[in-house]
Amino acid sequence: MSEVKRGVIVNYRMGRHTQDPRQCIIEFEGVESRSEAAQLIGKEVIWKHPETGKVIRGKVVDTHGNNGAVRVRFERGLPGQALGTEVTLK
């Protein structure tokens, strides 16, 4: 059985003139390197709205940088209130 990890949404995936609310950069606790983050690719991520309880699911698609952050693609775009909130990894 896999352990549940908690992470924090750092930001949307951004370009010079655009941002993509469907893809987010997330840092998980205990993940400190690119190789550790690469082991999370393909796993499911769940964000739950703190007030309404609405759930948006996503999937880890790639690493981001060399310090353990990952890029997650969600099924729907996340609201701006989601930035800085917690997600769980299954």
Swiss-Prot record:
One of its GO terms (biological process) is translation. GO terms for molecular function: structural constituent of ribosome. One of its GO terms (cellular component) is ribosome. Pfam families: Ribosomal_L35Ae. Keywords: Ribonucleoprotein, Ribosomal protein. SUPFAM superfamilies: Translation proteins. InterPro entries: Ribosomal_eL33, Ribosomal_eL33_CS, Ribosomal_eL33_sf, Transl_B-barrel_sf. It comes from the Archaea. Belongs to the eukaryotic ribosomal protein eL33 family. This is Large ribosomal subunit protein eL33. It comes from Methanopyrus kandleri (strain AV19 / DSM 6324 / JCM 9639 / NBRC 100938). The lineage of its organism: Archaea, Methanobacteriati, Methanobacteriota, Methanomada group, Methanopyri.
